[in-house]
Amino acid sequence: MPGESIIPELYMPVTPEIVTSMTDNPGDAVETMVERLEDDHYDISDADRDLLLDLDRQIRLLGPSEFSDHRHEFLLRRGLIIAKRVGGLAAGVDDRDAAEDIVQWINTEQTGSPETNKDYRVAFRTIAKIVTDGEGYPDAVEWIPGGYPDNYDPAPDPTDMLGWEEDIQPMLDACLNSRDRALVALAWDLGPRPGELYELTPGNIVDHDYGLQVTLNGKTGRRSPVLVPSVPYVRRWLDDHPGGDTDPLWCKLSTPESISNNRVRDALKDVADRAGVEKTVTPTYFRKSSASYLASQGVSQAHLEEHHGWTRGSDIASRYIAVFDDANEREIARAHGLDVEADEPDAVGPIVCPRCEQKTPREKDACVWCGQVLSQTAAEKVEEQRQTARNDMVGADEKLANALATVENQLGDDVSLRIEGLDE
């Protein structure tokens, strides 16, 4: 399995002062970097400093319709890292030799994944295009490849994916509070980008006919996917949340003060450790796992793109469909004369309590809201516990046992009043 890291590998080669600001809101992170550039805080050349400040000005002039806060921060940060680690950023915009030095560093010394290195190459080319005011890329950078190495296999590995039954449910059982349960369930159900996950507020979540609807403002625009299996856990945290609609969703348990992005990642890792889940549990892997589950259940590429905020015809979405949708294999088997039937989707969504009509986790024996037992097995278990307790009571104190029997006769068959300890 891939190694675990609290800080995503995209930021691994950077110096501590850069890592510190990367966990903030992207708009705030941009302001911090600009202030430090203006104060000559960074150990970079004057030419590179001036170019980065010009980059910031040009992005602000083009406005949010062209560059979101995330994209603004993405370009400015990578430009700053190149200026610090290699230098010659300003020269590389106009000079092929200087540009080659930067690309060589990206390809050989910038110790990231193929995706990370691609991001740096694309960012470098885009920076050059923005600051030269041209219609296209300057000659010095136009040649820079924006793709992946020939031997790069971007297909998701099924063994890395987090499954609801084998991974998510044990993590939910290992959580110590309603916030962490909501975090685990929502991250898998919604599959948001890390930045989208961190920036959620209670006001982003509203009721929907099929569950809860979440409004996200991602890099491809606004979308509003629907939560299903995570609904009971998210509702419980919304009830327990100490703040209002505009406060951070992921806050401290007793105050609406935001917890850091690092703390959100730590919470996932801590829960996984307690549950014995050894797979990578970063927000990115929750996103990948969400996509893999939807693809495996026959969700179309168009719907997967809409749910995860990918552009139409996305190569990423098509990879998940190719790896996890077994429709092609079924058709080939059918062509060879086998009697093949499509598997029924795995049931992971919540069930509706017949008493209070709230959604409760499918795996629970009793409604988490009103205590109503939800299966014959659960009812029998409650009755068995009651009989055992009554027998013990008779042996210890016959008068108290008779009093208890009187109370039970008044309660009748309403075992929900006794269900509190059933799952303990």
What is the predicted function of each stretch?
Residues 245, 265-306, 310, 314, ...:
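Short, basic (Lys/Arg/His-rich) helix/loop patches that form interaction surfaces
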Residues 161-194:
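Basic, Lys/Arg- and aromatic-enriched nucleic-acid-binding interface segment
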Residues 187-209, 301-306:
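Short, charged phosphate-coordinating catalytic segments
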Residues 219-220, 308-343, 374-377:
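Catalytic-site neighborhood detector that most strongly recognizes the C-terminal catalytic loop/helix
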Residues 2-13, 17, 21-28, 123-127, ...:
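Basic, alpha-helical nucleic-acid-contacting "clamp/cap" segments
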Residues 1, 31-43, 52-157:
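N-terminal core-binding DNA-recognition domain of tyrosine recombinases/integrases
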Residues 1-77, 136, 391, 395, ...:
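Basic/aromatic DNA-contact patch characteristic of tyrosine site-specific recombinases
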Residues 17-22, 334-424:
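C-terminal secondary-structure termini that scaffold catalytic or DNA-interacting sites
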